Structure formats: C-alpha cells, structure tokens
C-alpha cells in the first residue's frame, strides 16, 4: 500500500465516533474507496458538498428561527429609528445626497428603457378585466415596478457609501475603532475567477459535474425570475411584496453586509452562517424597510435611513454583547429583632432557642 498521504475523504472512522483520530492512531481505510475509485469519489463529493451545505443552512434556520424571532423582534422598528436619527443631523447629509443621486440616475434609466414596454404589457393584461380602470392602474403599477427594480440595483451594488454610514454611526456612538475601520475601506471591484481552464473543458469532471450543475442552477434561477415576474403583475401588492421578501434581490440583509464584510472581514462561508442563523431578524428588517422603499422617489432617501437603522441595530448588539451580565442577587431574609437585648449578634440569633 502506498504511504503517501490521502485526502480527507479517503479515511474513515466508525460513524458513531465523536472524536477525531488520536495521535499515533491508524486510520481505517474504506475498502470500497481505493485508488482506482479516486476520480469517482471526487465526482460524488462534488454533488454531496452542496447538498450538505443546504442541509446545514436549513438546520441553522430551524434551530434559531423562533429564538431569534423572540429576542430580536424590536428590529422591526429600527428603520424608523434610522429616520429619527437622521432628521436634523448633518453628519449623514452628504452621504444621503450621493445615494439619492445614484437612485435617481438608476430610476431615470429604468423608466426610459422599460416603462413604455411595461406599461403597454400591463394595459393589455388589465384591459379585459378592468376596462377603463386599466390605464391608471397600469401607470401606477409601472411606477412601482420601476421603483422595485431601482431598489434592487442600488442595494445590489457593492456600495461603499453604506460602509461610510456605519462609520458615522459608530463615531456618534463612541465606537472609535470601528469608525476608523469603516473610514479606511476602499472600493475594490470583484475579481471573477475562471472555474475551468481550457483543458478542463475536455475532462470527465466537466461533463459529469460542472455542466449538470450549471443547468440545474440556470433553470432554478429562471424559475425564480418567472415567479418574481408573475408577482410583479399583481396590482400594487406585488412589487411591494417583492421589496419585503428577505430572499429577493432587494433583501434587507444588504444593509448589514457592510459591517460583516468590510469591518469583520467575514468570508462567504461565515457570512452565509450569519445570514441563516439570524434569518428571523433579517426577515423582520426586510418587511419593515421594504415598506419604506416602496414609496416612489422618497424610497431613495429611505435607503439611506434604512442603512442608518441597520447600523443602530449593530451598535445595540455590540453594546449588549460587551455589557457584563449581572446575576440577580438573592432576596434578603428579614431579621427578627429581639426586644431589649444587647447581646452580640450570634447570641441574639440563638436567643429564641436558649432564652435568658
């Protein structure tokens, strides 16, 4: 047998063993996973890994949803606290102007390229059912659809201004180190890595793993896009609902990513754990902030105040975590005074047993 070290999947312990291999312990080699089945096992692991990851994410939601919902229900008011924090405060003003300008630019582009097509399509759909009411309803629906798409584009950008808002909030709340960390962030564009080299296009792994997974995800995203399209056609309620969904393109978790990514520098695996473990509070924040974002034009201002509200929630979590827990003191037992006794305390305590 070869003495070269094998990959982790090659070794096997008893399934009920709760501890890793001890020092000097010989691993048990699976008889079915020999060197001849090395490539077959790699292909199996390529399919097994995403299934295991999805299962772990589902278990994180299942184990923490109700506890997090009970402990973090106050987060639903924090978008409105962001508004009250921003009113009359000039520290956020220049950041709000930049976000609002970027919002208006996206809204104008969306209206220019999609409004005529969307309005015509909606009129054709609503006209047989609503008659003359189809024209104003299609107009209102087109505005809401454009607002929803604009929110997705603004929040879906790797936006350094959200991080700057966190820096202002941290400075106002006395968290100097975190504020300095936010101010030193610079925008770095994404680097797209090639999944396969040219030689990999002719490998067995490409045809058995990469290509099937590509089509699975492709049709899955097509299905999601089709469901969102049907939801957008629902008058008034549809676009507002999409803004409120936590897994939609404009989910509320985008407001918290600057802290976890730019300040804590979490990788994708840890960020995914944070998202699924706290799914309940992101859901509540998505619902509350999505209602504000659905207001046309003013939604561009509310995106900035929603970021302020998210930073206030992070400040609250930091202070709650750093504040030491004080155990409750036991209630003091009432003392029975002894009338006319000047004896020491010990003798007073036994006076009722041995009276003078």
From Swiss-Prot:
Present with 155 molecules/cell in log phase SD medium. Residues 114-115, 235-294 are extracellular. GO terms for biological process: ascospore wall assembly. Residues 1-92, 137-213, 316-356 are cytoplasmic. Belongs to the LDS family. It comes from Saccharomyces cerevisiae (strain ATCC 204508 / S288c). The chain crosses the membrane at residues 93-113, 116-136, 214-234, 295-315. Involved in spore wall assembly. This is Outer spore wall protein LDS2. Coiled coil: none annotated. Residues 322-356 are annotated as: Disordered. Disruption phenotype: A combined deletion of the LDS proteins RRT8, LDS1 and LDS2 fails to incorporate dityrosine and another yet uncharacterized component in the outer spore wall.
């Amino acid at each position: 047998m070869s003495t070269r070290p094998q990959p982790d999947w090659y070794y096997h312990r008893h399934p009920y063993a709760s501890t890793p291999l001890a020092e000097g312990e010989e691993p048990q080699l699976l008889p079915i996973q020999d060197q001849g089945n090395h490539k077959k096992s790699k292909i199996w692991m390529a399919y097994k890994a995403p299934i295991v990851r999805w299962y772990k994410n589902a278990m994180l939601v299942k184990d923490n949803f109700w506890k997090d919902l009970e402990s973090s229900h106050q987060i639903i008011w924090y978008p409105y606290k962001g508004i009250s924090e921003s009113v009359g405060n000039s520290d956020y003003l220049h950041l709000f102007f930049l976000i609002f300008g970027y919002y208006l630019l996206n809204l104008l582009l969306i209206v220019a390229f999609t409004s005529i097509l969307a309005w015509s399509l909606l009129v054709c759909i609503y006209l047989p059912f609503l008659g003359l009411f189809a024209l104003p309803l299609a107009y209102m629906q087109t505005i809401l659809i454009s607002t929803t798409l604009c929110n997705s584009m603004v929040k879906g950008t790797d936006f350094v201004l959200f991080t700057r808002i966190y820096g202002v909030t941290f400075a106002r709340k006395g968290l100097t180190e975190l504020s300095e960390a936010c101010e030193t962030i610079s925008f770095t564009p994404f680097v797209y890595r090639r999944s396969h080299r040219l030689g990999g296009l002719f490998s067995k792994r490409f045809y058995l793993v990469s290509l099937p997974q590509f089509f699975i995800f492709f049709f899955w995203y097509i299905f999601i896009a089709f469901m969102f399209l049907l939801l957008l056609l629902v008058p008034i309620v549809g676009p507002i609902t999409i803004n409120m969904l936590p897994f939609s393109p404009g989910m509320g978790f985008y407001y918290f990513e600057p802290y976890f990514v730019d300040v804590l520098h979490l990788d994708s695996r840890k960020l995914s754990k944070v998202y699924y473990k706290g799914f309940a509070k992101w859901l509540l924040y998505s619902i509350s902030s999505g209602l504000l974002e659905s207001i046309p034009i003013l939604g561009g201002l509310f995106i900035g105040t929603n970021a302020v509200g998210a930073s206030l929630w992070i400040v609250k979590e930091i202070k709650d975590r750093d504040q030491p827990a004080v155990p409750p003191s036991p209630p003091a037992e009432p003392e029975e005074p002894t009338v006319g006794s000047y004896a020491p305390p010990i003798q007073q305590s036994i006076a009722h047993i041995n009276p003078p």
